Amino acid sequence: MNGLIMAGQLLLGLSLLVILHELGHFLAARAFGIKVEKFYLFFDAWGFKLFSFKKGDVEYGVGWLPLGGYVKIAGMIDESMDTEQMAQPAQPWEFRSKPAWQRLIVMLGGIIVNVIVGIIIFWMLTFKYGQNYTVNGKLTDGISVGNIGKEIGLKNGDRILAINGSKLIKFEDAISSKVLFDGAQLTILRGNQTLYISVPDTILNKLSKNDKENFIAPRYRMASVATVLAPDEKADQQSFFDKIFGRPYVKPVYPAYAAGIKPGDSILAVNGKSVTFFDQFKEEVSQNKNKQITINALRKGKEINFDVLVGKEGTIGIAPNFKMPETAHVEFGFAESLPIGATMAWSTFLDNAKGIGKMITGKLSARNISSPIGIAKVYGSTFDWVKFWTLTGLISMALAFMNLLPIPGLDGGHVVFLLIEMVQRKPVSEKVLEKAQIVGFVILICLMVFAFGNDILKSFGK
């Protein structure tokens, strides 16, 4: 069921974005009197399709291959490679008969719509839900530092005062792209000492293999045990994707449950060492993989010791209650939400550009390229309206950027050839366009295979 929810959210989000993207091309073409022959969600490769109907001169349908969609524009060299049509004399209602500036607008139509959709999504989310953030000035216990944060010199309990000299108001900014992409300088208060620590611009490559908590997070004081993982026949099942990829099923273990720890217990010490903060508890436990530890806890005013065998992952299967840091909520009016939404959309677009740049320069591994499998996992196994639209907005901006790349077969490839035509004042030959289309198609197939391979290997923990 979890896998179906993931797949369903992915299908819904991508289908919406693909239809709107292709609608951008469709409307631009029709506005200039260009004939559109097909409008398809998914590809009807080799002529197979789920269904179709014809209205006017346009065939609308749903293909069987869920890797995007397309509009077939008359007189245009595209993925259909209809060379027979291109061999005929150009007709006034064909793409190739129109001025270069009109063809350029048609090719940019889908990208423009994706950008507009991204802005609208972030605009409406900001207007409807406002913004929540952790008040950095209230983090009196400082930060909890993961392994990657420790590598650059950060320590548990440090307080971040500023980023690149600007006072840090929202803690979330410390784990945003302005720090992770651009190699920022952090102003740190450690005890009574002010320090300056530089974040290397290669740090994202390490974080991509983990989560942001392996960098920094607010430091949480432990209260009591909230949850103790216990055997559950329904929950203890092999995941949907593990079944697909044949990954061996490992039955979960429940060390805390087996030792007798219960929700409501307050953990005081591990192996005699006091643990006030969750990072202290986590560190003591993780250092004792496959070993027995003694946990001292308080239950109804009475101290009790538990002998717990730590699992091979370095966990014991509990989730504590935390004394959460202070957060702030800001509401925005309808009009003032627009520039905020536009800024969020533009930042997402720039982050995609920076990511590609870092891959080209070797500062970010190409292993971060994801297929629909990876995207589905990001959507998650439960439906959350805000998360769904946030991710859909992010993907809309990512699609806009990816389609702008100068790869033949993508919108950006067509744009490059049109710009060349406008500069040299004569069109690029159809033979060159046809060969470029084939090369681009091969590149895209290779990228797709690579992306699926990445996600399959990740599912095996490689």
What role is predicted for each listed range?
Residues 14-18, 72, 114, 118, ...:
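Alpha-helical transmembrane segments of multi-pass membrane proteins
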Residues 2-86, 402-424:
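Small-residue-rich helix-interface/hinge motifs
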Residues 2, 6-10, 98-107, 387-391:
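Residue-level signature of transmembrane alpha-helical entry/exit and packing/kink sites
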Residues 69, 73-80, 84-145, 236, ...:
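Internal alpha-helical transmembrane segments
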Residues 149, 157-160, 256, 264-267:
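A structural signal for short beta-strand/turn segments enriched in small hydrophobics and glycine
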Residues 82-123, 163-211, 352:
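Interdomain regulatory linker/hinge segments that flank or connect interaction modules
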Residues 89-98, 212-266, 273-401, 416-439, ...:
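Functional transmembrane alpha-helices
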